[in-house]
A protein has these predicted regions:
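Conserved phosphate-binding elements of NTP-dependent enzyme cores
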Residues: 1-826
């Protein structure tokens, strides 16, 4: 009899408590639990780690050397685990040459279509040649006008990453040009006062004197210069001028011959010398990116834009949204001569089968030429998922980490359909998620908990969804079976705008139509809508830049007609990007707790006797850091023929400190004595009890506790935090301040949050609102939307079918709006 389940015995990865669990094979298995309860540790740290490692071990040593390999999971035994693939919560951001079409491989089918089935252009006389099977057969075409023969371009000749690239932009579709408006942002200043910014930041300051020798008055406001003087500043010739250079200390003048660099050339010269991101950042403020003037942003050469199918070229086809492209491709075979239709149908079927799942996952609003780097995390994850389904593999374990991220409730059925397809093909799907609509579709449900961190790591419920719903110990059960309720009191229509308005009017940008919005100040405002409806464009690309510009007295973005937000001095985006670049950044250092602890330990008698000051207690640079791992807590071993092995430092056992640090104790109010390494190994909640008497530390720890982060250890590296944890940690410094001049914007703050964690998040928002802040969230989570004071629903659809404010008002108003797709689910 074949195995029926993956048998996990004695799993101890991260906070897992030596657990035993059987995961049914060939089923859709959901894993639930509060944040930090051990869900990902079980799914990714045990199931995926062991499934992928064992598959790779079956390969040759030569092959394994070229692959990234995982270390053995901390588990006694895992039996019957299939080869595993993981779809992570944060797929990598693709490079500048990647588009939605290349990521999904839809461009491959399109290029083949335009190579084999197009009306090609004769390179000799420019006449169009009817579609012919000669192209597929590798034969030449004969021009009906001039009679000369030529070969049609192959699929590779139509690729913007290969032979079809525009020679001007190299296939990127964009050109960087100097933005003259940014060179002199304040024309009320004189040149001597620094009106021409590049001369003070990218070029020697004495260029002001050279400009004076060029005939430009440098002691009058820039806006009073004559047109010819302005032209010299921006475009003057590179000629040598004799100047007297006086150093800042005023001692002695030195005669110099100096070549004049006009303001535009100063930037162009600096750009040409850029060697890294830091250098580009200095120059970027003076640049604007625009479409390539030769290819118009299509990335394709003129020759690659010549072939036509159904009256359009490849660039025009790629500019379509996926939904429009599907409709267009359906009509291609019928537009061709009868003998070509079978071949065209095969190519079109390949395109349509790949597109079907992308449409099911709600990505039909994306254009094929959309730059891959501009896709959201959820969009990239769904592209990844659709690609996996198309492979039609069998006998594989797929581990999906929160695939519902960024997914509107209207698209959940499509996601479940994709996962069911994988199971129907004979695979096992393990999905870590918090969305109760996704979990309710599982054949088998495992719940981890009961709480986060050290208090979690246990299986508190397992079985079918019905069995988990009846389980007394389950924390997800009430949300699987209960009707949703509103937690926060509803603000009445009469009170909604009591604290003021934020008003804004915009012109069209991307798919967002010209619109006006009115946002109540001092309220929790949710911006909703299906994927691609314009939420991100409205809030992140329009509202935040406009508020920041107005607060700084600068020009608002060109597509913003006007903004009225009197009294708003700060616009803060709290996003889910990881905090810190390496393991040296920890929860304690980011929250300014570690500095206070170092000072406290430096005041102890033992530290004073040894001559240790606060700096000695730094694990990054201090004298007490571990010399073996240099304060990182881990070391990397280079093992030949095997991957580098990252292990806990054997000298400090992960504490980051040398043994000397364990001899310096601080006495608590209860008489207990603790070392700094011991404190750093504690959770926030444990440290609250251990640091009584340290007022600043207590206040900061209490803030983290109130943010729902009490389970995090002080020494936990910040890059390892989930998106939701990172967002809340970034808020730590803002809590407790008066915020009536502030707007806080959260981009999908419920990412990675259990329904119970969403309640904690709502309490955090209440704390900000109580201090006068205006809190704006871009969100799909129905529990959060239901608890907002005010909702702005974008749509009605995605892409060209969206970009409008469908309705705005209380959640009840949205639910009653017949045009709102979000309202149907509320």
């Amino acid at each position: 009899m074949s195995p029926q389940a993956i048998e996990v015995r004695g799993a101890r990865v991260h906070n897992l408590k030596d657990i035993d669990i059987d995961i049914p094979l060939g089923k859709l298995v959901g894993i639930a639990g509060v944040s930090g309860s051990g869900k990902s540790s079980l799914a990714l740290g045990v199931l995926y780690a062991e499934g992928s490692r064992r598959y790779l071990e079956a390969l040759s040593t030569y092959t394994r050397r070229r692959l990234t390999q995982a270390e053995h999971a901390q588990v006694d035994e895992v039996l019957h685990v299939p080869a595993a693939l993981a779809l992570h919560q944060r797929p990598s951001v693709p490079g500048v040459r990647s588009t939605f079409g290349t990521m999904t491989e839809l461009n491959n089918s399109l290029r083949l279509l335009f190579s084999r089935c197009a009306h090609h252009v004769c390179p000799h006389c420019g006449a169009r040649v009817e579609p012919s099977l000669n192209v597929a057969a590798g034969l030449s075409l004969t021009c009906p006008v001039c009679g000369r023969e030529f070969y049609a371009p192959g699929a590779e000749d139509l690729a913007f990453n290969s032979g079809g690239a525009c020679p001007t932009c190299g296939g990127t579709g964009v050109m960087r040009e100097v933005d003259e408006a940014s060179l002199v942002p304040d024309e009320s200043k004189t040149i001597n006062e620094g009106a021409v910014l590049p001369w003070g930041t990218l070029m020697w300051d004495l260029m002001k004197q050279v400009a004076g020798e060029m005939g430009v008055r440098t002691d009058v406001p820039f806006n009073q210069l004559m047109p010819q003087e302005r032209d010299i500043v921006f475009h003057g010739p590179a000629v040598k001028k004799h100047i007297l250079y006086v150093p800042k200390n005023g001692e002695g003048a030195t005669p110099l011959d100096f070549t004049y660099y006009n303001a535009v050339y100063t930037v162009e010269n600096a750009l040409a010398k850029v060697k890294d991101d830091k250098g580009l950042k200095r120059v970027a403020r003076f640049l604007r990116e625009g479409p390539c003037r030769d290819c118009g942003g299509t990335r394709l050469s003129e020759a690659a834009r010549q072939p036509q199918v159904r009256g359009i070229n490849l660039a025009q086809a790629a500019a379509m949204t996926l939904g429009d492209a599907v409709e267009w491709v359906h009509g291609v075979p019928a537009s061709l001569p009868p003998e070509m239709r079978p071949m065209a149908a095969d190519i079109c079927d390949s395109f349509l089968s790949a597109a079907r799942r992308l449409v099911d996952l709600g990505l039909d609003y994306l254009s094929l030429d959309r730059a891959g780097a501009t896709l959201s995390t959820g969009e990239r994850q769904r592209v990844q998922l659709a690609r996996v389904v198309r492979n039609r593999s069998t006998g594989v374990l797929y581990v999906l980490d929160e695939p519902s991220i960024g997914l509107h409730p209207a698209n959940v059925d499509g996601l479940v359909g994709v996962m069911r397809d994988l199971v129907d093909d004979g695979n096992t799907v393990v999905v870590v998620d918090h969305d109760t609509r996704v979990l309710a579709e599982a054949d088998y449900l495992v719940e981890m908990g009961p709480v986060a961190g050290a208090g979690g790591g246990n299986v508190i419920a397992a079985g079918t969804v019905d069995e988990v719903e009846q389980s007394q110990g389950s924390r997800i059960a009430p949300f699987l079976r209960a009707d949703p309720k509103r937690m926060r009191p509803q603000v009445t229509d009469e009170e909604m705008f009591d604290q003021g308005h934020i008003r804004m009017a915009t012109d069209a940008i991307h798919t967002v139509k010209p619109l006006e919005v009115d946002i109540p100040r001092g309220r929790l405002v949710a911006v909703t809508g299906v994927s691609g409806s314009g939420k991100t464009t409205l809030v992140l690309e329009t509202l935040i830049p406009a508020l920041k510009a107005q607060a700084a007295g600068e020009r608002v973005p060109s597509h913003v007609r006007w903004v009225d937000a009197e009294g708003i001095a700060r616009a803060n985006l709290i996003d889910a990007t990881p905090i810190g670049a390496n393991v040296r950044s920890t929860v304690a250092t980011y929250a300014d707790i570690h500095d206070e602890l170092r000072r406290a330990f430096a005041r102890t008698p033992e530290a004073k006797a040894a001559g240790y000051k606060a700096g000695a207690f730094s694990y990054n640079t201090g004298a007490l850091r571990c010399p073996t791992c240099d304060g990182t807590g881990s070391i990397s071993l280079d093992v030949q023929f095997l991957p580098d092995v990252e292990i806990i430092c054997p000298a400090c056992r992960g504490s980051r400190y040398a043994d000397t640090a364990s001899h310096i104790h601080r006495e608590g109010k209860d008489g207990s004595k603790l070392t700094l390494p011991q404190l750093m190994d504690m959770s926030v909640d444990e440290a609250l009890d251990a640091t009584v008497g340290l007022k600043k530390v207590q206040a900061r720890l209490l803030t983290l506790h109130d943010l729902g982060l009490g389970y995090l250890t002080l020494g936990e590296p910040t890059p390892a935090l989930s998106g939701g944890e990172a967002q809340r940690l970034k808020l730590a410094s803002e809590m407790g301040r008066v915020q009536d001049d502030a707007v806080f914007v959260f981009d999908e703050p419920t990412i990675g949050l259990h329904p119970l964690d969403v309640q904690v998040l709502l309490n955090v928002f209440d704390g900000l609102v109580a201090k006068g802040a205006t809190v704006i969230v871009i969100e799909h989570d129905l529990d959060l939307i239901r608890n907002a004071d005010y909702v702005i629903d974008m749509g009605p659809g995605g892409g060209d079918a969206g970009g409008q404010v469908v309705c705005a008002g209380t959640p009840a108003d949205i639910a009653a709006c017949s045009k709102s797709i979000t309202g149907r689910y509320l």
